[in-house]
């Protein structure tokens, strides 16, 4: 596939997803698939929860128009379709966490049993020897599926953030896969971005506040599952184009935020799934930034971490264990900042005041 053909297909996918969103939001309002404001959700009015359904429709359209051979795409669509359906039911009726976890385990088992996708190896992340998981890899894979889905679900807290972080992750994967000649998987990653961008435009209100939509659990579940599916295809096997440790950098911010949040909740004796306002975007907004500024800052941080992962992947002289050590160092720094969020917030507020004062003095002089 040449670049012109890929670009043309991506434009078609973008236009289809945009048109589908406008149609789907009207249907969602009629059937009650909307998000209502409450004590945790500060938006105004009823917002259609159709972002995830639109992304899934866009992916189906992408598979329909491309000539690329996507491995096990029928199984993926069946699993993803089930997750989107259950996610939409949860968006509409707020179903049990146990039911959602069971369905996530079900699609994870199908992915391993039918497609043969599971974590056989962690590569050379722990030294010069390869870390082969053997039968234990099936258990680790189920946990990875659950972790990826919930990591992306938990960052969906302010406008644009889930879409921005998703585009960073799929963009990094797409670049590495394209450079490795894996055109079908690269197209899949770029198609995900093409389906997500229309959602971002509407979610941020860039096409008018009255057209605003949310992703919903259907969308965050789909994005997390798609990310882990592609990463398993790209990091496992003898000729894998991406090292397993690079996957950590690609989804760094969602992963770090999820681990930090769950650790903090468990320490307080709370359920790890109980809602609160302690996510990274909440902490940044408490430091005096707007939700739009928090979205930009977090997305840029995710892009920086993903770029480090991409560079580490390309520079073959850097051992995988060094990349793991650097990631753990970045995670410790993240945890330190989150644990002392009030100090960080106070420092940022003081810095912003000094900058405003300096700017004011400059204008007066």
Curated annotation (Swiss-Prot):
Compartments, record wording: Cell inner membrane
Domain of life: Bacteria
Transmembrane segment boundaries: 3-23, 45-65, 99-119, 132-152, 157-177, 187-207, 213-233, 242-262, 293-313, 315-335
Gene Ontology BP, a term: cell wall macromolecule biosynthetic process
Keywords: Cell inner membrane, Cell membrane, Glycosyltransferase, Lipopolysaccharide biosynthesis, Magnesium, Manganese, Membrane, Transferase, Transmembrane, Transmembrane helix
E.C. no: 2.7.8.33
NCBIfam families hit by this protein: ECA_wecA
UniProt-recorded name of the protein: Undecaprenyl-phosphate alpha-N-acetylglucosaminyl 1-phosphate transferase
């Amino acid at each position: 596939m040449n670049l012109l053909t890929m670009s043309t297909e991506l434009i078609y996918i973008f236009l289809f997803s945009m048109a589908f969103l406008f149609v789907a939001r009207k249907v969602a309002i009629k059937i009650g698939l909307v998000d209502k404001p409450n004590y945790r959700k500060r938006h105004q009015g009823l917002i259609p929860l159709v972002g995830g359904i639109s992304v899934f429709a866009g992916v189906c359209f992408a598979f329909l128009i491309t000539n690329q051979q996507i491995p096990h795409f029928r199984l993926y669509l069946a699993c993803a379709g089930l997750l989107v359906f259950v996610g939409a039911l949860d968006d509409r009726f707020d179903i049990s966490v146990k039911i959602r976890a069971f369905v996530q385990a079900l699609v994870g088992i199908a992915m391993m049993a039918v497609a043969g996708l599971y974590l056989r190896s962690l590569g050379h992340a722990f030294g010069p020897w390869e870390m082969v998981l053997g039968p234990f890899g099936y258990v680790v894979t189920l946990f990875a599926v659950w972790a990826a889905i919930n990591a992306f679900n938990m960052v969906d807290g302010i406008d644009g953030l889930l879409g921005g972080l998703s585009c960073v992750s799929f963009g990094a994967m797409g670049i590495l896969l394209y450079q490795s000649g894996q055109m079908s998987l690269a197209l899949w990653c770029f198609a995900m971005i093409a389906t997500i961008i229309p959602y971002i435009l509407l979610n941020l209100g860039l096409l008018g506040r009255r057209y605003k939509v949310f992703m919903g659990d259907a969308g965050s579940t789909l994005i997390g599952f798609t990310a882990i599916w592609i990463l398993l295809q790209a990091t496992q096997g003898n000729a894998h184009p991406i090292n397993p440790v690079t996957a950590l950098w690609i989804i760094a911010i969602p992963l770090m935020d999820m681990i930090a949040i769950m650790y903090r909740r468990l320490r307080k004796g709370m359920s790890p799934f109980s809602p609160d306002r302690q996510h990274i975007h909440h902490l940044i907004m408490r430091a005096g930034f707007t939700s739009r500024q928090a979205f930009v800052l977090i997305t840029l941080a995710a892009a920086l971490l993903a770029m480090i992962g991409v560079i580490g992947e390309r520079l073959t002289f850097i051992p995988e264990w060094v990349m793991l050590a650097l990631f753990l160092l970045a995670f410790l720094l993240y945890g330190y900042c989150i644990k002392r969020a009030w100090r960080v917030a106070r420092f940022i507020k003081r810095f912003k005041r000094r900058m405003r004062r300096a700017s004011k003095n400059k204008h007066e002089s």
